[in-house]
């Protein structure tokens, strides 16, 4: 029994070292993370440039989100649909703002990342809820899929997609509800873990690191389950909701979640920091410099995705904006009538 317990602990430590590698940087002096006034008054030249670009990117993203909000408010007539879209509109500005604030206030980098991921997880459930709404409810959702003989295919990311043969399931209300719960559990679990982490840090200080590592592994498992659930549902609905640009909307949120949550642990921690490719600075250690650069990259990525969303989800080819097409038809009719009147006048 003791041998099995030791093996399990070794496996957990190995997974933890992959997720949160130890700081192997050769910083000569150890110091506390600087406050925002201290950091902003002693910026290095490259940090000034990155902050300037990040502030510009964040401003553009916020302006684009206001434009998106206006179009949803004006051209989406169904209030329930509007309220769901408001959540999704805020994805890019929330991620961009969290990253920019974390650049300016280094002490908040970890907590703002947690808050940003929590918002993303809530938006994943909003996407599932939006798909159910567009079908007219869960019963109609299930009936439509069964009528088209579309079973639930479990070969979805992050891991099941590499398994060649998996059994399918009937698209019943019960199975759809189970997939919805796979997505809904993620924000609930993340909220509980954030609360427990705050309590652990407040009570145990530096000794809370092992507990935070295990809680991060639990939240990662919860996140992967949510990604599996939302991908499985999205793939089933892709053909039926193409007029609403649903898959484009889902892919944009999915890719931005990947950028926001996976770059820091996978690229910066497990590659750049592990091999000492990011060094210490006068005020920030290697880990904090990694967060700074990663947050800058996220602001740029959110700007690109926001511009892409403006083009891909435009009302002119998106049935989600149900009040936009009648106005277009009215304007086209008015234009044709004016042309007819002018031709009649010229004939006379």
From Swiss-Prot:
Known SMART domains for this protein?
Solute_trans_a
Segments on the Extracellular face:
1-49, 106-109, 202-213, 262-291
Keywords assigned: Cell membrane, Glycoprotein, Membrane, Transmembrane, Transmembrane helix, Transport
Q: According to its UniProt record, where is this protein located?
A: Cell membrane
Q: Which GO terms label this protein's molecular function in UniProt?
A: transmembrane transporter activity
**One GO cellular component term noted in the UniProt record for this chain:** plasma membrane
Q: Which InterPro entries match?
A: Ostalpha/TMEM184C
What stretch or stretches form a coiled coil here? Answer: none
Residues assigned to the Cytoplasmic compartment are 71-84, 131-180, 235-240, 313-348
List the glycosylation sites.
Answer: 26
Query: How does the record say this protein sits in the membrane?
Result: Multi-pass membrane protein
Q: Does the keyword Hydrolase apply?
A: no
TM ranges are: 50-70, 85-105, 110-130, 181-201, 214-234, 241-261, 292-312
* Top-rank taxon, per record: Eukaryota
Function text = Probable transporter.
Protein family according to the UniProt entry: Belongs to the OST-alpha family.
Question: What is the recorded name of this protein?
Answer: Organic solute transporter alpha-like protein 3
Q: Which organism is it from?
A: Caenorhabditis elegans
* Upper classification of the organism: Eukaryota, Metazoa, Ecdysozoa, Nematoda, Chromadorea
């Amino acid at each position: 029994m003791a041998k099995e317990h030791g093996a399990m602990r070794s496996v957990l430590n190995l997974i933890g070292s992959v997720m949160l590698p130890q700081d192997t940087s050769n910083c000569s002096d150890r110091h506390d993370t600087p406050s925002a006034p201290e950091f902003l008054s002693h910026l290095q030249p490259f940090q000034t440039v990155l902050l300037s670009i990040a502030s510009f990117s964040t401003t553009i993203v916020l302006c684009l989100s206001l434009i998106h909000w206006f179009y949803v408010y004006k051209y989406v007539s169904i209030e329930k649909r509007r309220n769901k879209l408001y959540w999704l509109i805020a994805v890019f500005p929330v991620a961009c703002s969290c990253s920019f604030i974390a650049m300016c206030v280094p002490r908040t980098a970890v907590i703002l990342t947690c808050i940003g991921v929590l918002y993303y997880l809530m938006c994943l459930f909003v996407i599932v809820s939006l798909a159910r709404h567009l079908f007219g409810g869960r019963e109609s959702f299930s009936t439509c899929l069964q009528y088209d003989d579309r079973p639930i295919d479990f070969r979805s990311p992050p891991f099941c997609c590499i398994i060649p043969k998996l059994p399918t399931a009937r698209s019943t209300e019960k199975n759809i509800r189970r997939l919805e719960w796979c997505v809904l559990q993620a924000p609930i679990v993340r909220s509980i873990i954030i609360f427990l982490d705050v309590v652990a840090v407040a009570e145990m200080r530096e000794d809370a690191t092992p507990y935070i590592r295990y809680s991060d592994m639990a939240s990662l498992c919860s996140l992967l389950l949510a990604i599996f659930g939302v991908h499985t549902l999205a793939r089933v609905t892709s053909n039926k909701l193409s007029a609403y640009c649903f898959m484009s909307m889902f892919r944009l949120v999915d890719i931005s979640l990947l950028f926001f949550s996976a770059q820091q642990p996978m690229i910066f921690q497990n590659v750049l920091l592990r091999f000492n490719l990011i060094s210490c600075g006068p005020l920030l250690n290697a880990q904090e410099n990694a967060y700074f650069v990663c947050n800058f990259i996220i602001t740029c990525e959110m700007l690109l995705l926001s511009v892409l969303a403006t083009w891909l989800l435009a009302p002119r080819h998106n049935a989600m904006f149900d009040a936009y097409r009648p106005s277009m038809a009215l304007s086209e009719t008015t234009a044709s009538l004016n042309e007819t009147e002018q031709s009649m006048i010229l004939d006379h």
